[in-house]
Structure formats: C-alpha cells, structure tokens
Amino acid sequence: MLNFLLQNTFVLWSNFILCKLPEAYAVFDPIVDVMPVIPVFFFLLAFVWQAAVSFR
C-alpha cells in the first residue's frame, strides 16, 4: 500500500513539475519559474535581520 502511494505521489509531482502553462499565461512563465525560490529569500532575510540587530 505504501509503495502504491509513493509511486502515485511521484507521478503526480513529476506531472506537476513538467507541466506547461496555458498559452494565454505564457507571459508569466519567467515569474512562475522564480516563485519556488521566494521562501528561501525570506529565510535569508531573517539572518540579515538578525545580523543587523547583532543576533540578540
């Protein structure tokens, strides 16, 4: 059962990663490519903020 769930999850994620936007939204493709990295910027911002206040 677990093997089936893992395989199913992999298939869904691989389809999600490889899918293309509809032609009407092709203009936003570069923005969509960058969107998964945005949370990393917030994580790094926390370190910059703490460095600015001397890691109190």
Swiss-Prot record:
SUPFAM superfamilies: Photosystem II reaction center protein K, PsbK (SSF161037). GO terms for biological process: photosynthesis. Residues 1-19 form a propeptide. InterPro entries: PSII_PsbK, PSII_PsbK_sf. Its main location: plastid. It is found in: Plastid, Chloroplast thylakoid membrane. The keyword Transmembrane applies. The chain crosses the membrane at residues 35-55. One of the components of the core complex of photosystem II (PSII). PSII is a light-driven water:plastoquinone oxidoreductase that uses light energy to abstract electrons from H(2)O, generating O(2) and a proton gradient subsequently used for ATP formation. It consists of a core antenna complex that captures photons, and an electron transfer chain that converts photonic excitation into a charge separation. Belongs to the PsbK family. PSII is composed of 1 copy each of membrane proteins PsbA, PsbB, PsbC, PsbD, PsbE, PsbF, PsbH, PsbI, PsbJ, PsbK, PsbL, PsbM, PsbT, PsbX, PsbY, PsbZ, Psb30/Ycf12, at least 3 peripheral proteins of the oxygen-evolving complex and a large number of cofactors. It forms dimeric complexes. HAMAP family: PSII_PsbK. This is Photosystem II reaction center protein K. The lineage of its organism: Eukaryota, Viridiplantae, Streptophyta, Embryophyta, Tracheophyta.
